[in-house]
Amino acid sequence: MTLFTTLLVLIFERLFKLGEHWQLDHRLEAFFRRVKHFSLGRTLGMTIIAMGVTFLLLRALQGVLFNVPTLLVWLLIGLLCIGAGKVRLHYHAYLTAASRNDSHARATMAGELTMIHGVPAGCDEREYLRELQNALLWINFRFYLAPLFWLIVGGTWGPVTLMGYAFLRAWQYWLARYQTPHHRLQSGIDAVLHVLDWVPVRLAGVVYALIGHGEKALPAWFASLGDFHTSQYQVLTRLAQFSLAREPHVDKVETPKAAVSMAKKTSFVVVVVIALLTIYGALV
């Protein structure tokens, strides 16, 4: 079920998910606007409710019509939670603006892509493009690699854990876009995701190390296994940058393309691993 769902979701996401319509983040915005108080307890409570509703839905559909409705729910939740249709539009808009030397449009789209972690003030063009690469790699992790990890971890209840992670991701993006840094801090969302991302970041990091320059990346990856304080964003992007060391860092079009190309390779490796685990009976 996991492999079948993953393949179909990735195919549908690539063909049809070109905007916000099939994005959980967009569907939850109306609900998030009603939240007036921010705390860690509220963040966890909302997430548990989302997971609980998903669990009850799957439980109610068990055994109905040869589990066809269950399969459809797996696909629907996977399509809502995996992939970043709107972000992909922002990325292509950035490339168009950069190729036309439209500095205003380019800066606007880069701002959308780097919304969560931002770009250091006063950085030069090379540093700016490296941070843009990092943002694209992180988007690939947040919208593809990490959701797939939680879908797998959940086993037969994969959509439940996937929904929980995607809900937290949507909550963080909404807070970053519409609320103050203080409200985001009060919500505790960054701390929760720091914990949840620890394992999937290390798994993604070892893939980056193996497909890139392992002689530099692998020692850094082993060092990260004992690091519980550095942000997961920094851990992942530092490992990825070892693999991107020989790629261009001065071309405003080719630099982000190099990051996206490597992110696609990593996603492909993950799908292959899922297929092998399914073949050998480790996944359902």
Swiss-Prot record:
Organism of origin is Escherichia coli (strain K12)
In terms of superkingdom, the source organism counts as Bacteria
- What are the subcellular locations of this protein? Cell inner membrane
What is an example of a Pfam family matching this protein?
AmpE
- Which of the residues are on side Cytoplasmic? 61-67, 212-267
TM helices/strands, residue ranges: 44-60, 68-84, 195-211, 268-284
Membrane topology listed for this record: Multi-pass membrane protein
Q: What's this chain's function?
A: Putative signaling protein in beta-lactamase regulation. AmpE seems not to act as a direct sensor for beta-lactams.
InterPro entries, sorted: AmpE, Beta-lactamase_Reg
Xref: PANTHER family: PROTEIN AMPE
Chief location category: membrane
| GN (gene name) | ampE
Topology check: give the Periplasmic ranges. Answer: 1-43, 85-194
Q: Give the GO terms filed under biological process for this record.
A: response to antibiotic
Example GO CC term: the record gives:
plasma membrane
Q: Which UniProt keywords apply?
A: Cell inner membrane, Cell membrane, Membrane, Transmembrane, Transmembrane helix
Question: What is its induction behaviour?
Answer: The level of AmpE affects the basal level of beta-lactamase expression in the absence of AmpD and in the presence of the AmpR transcriptional regulator.
Q: What is this protein called?
A: Protein AmpE
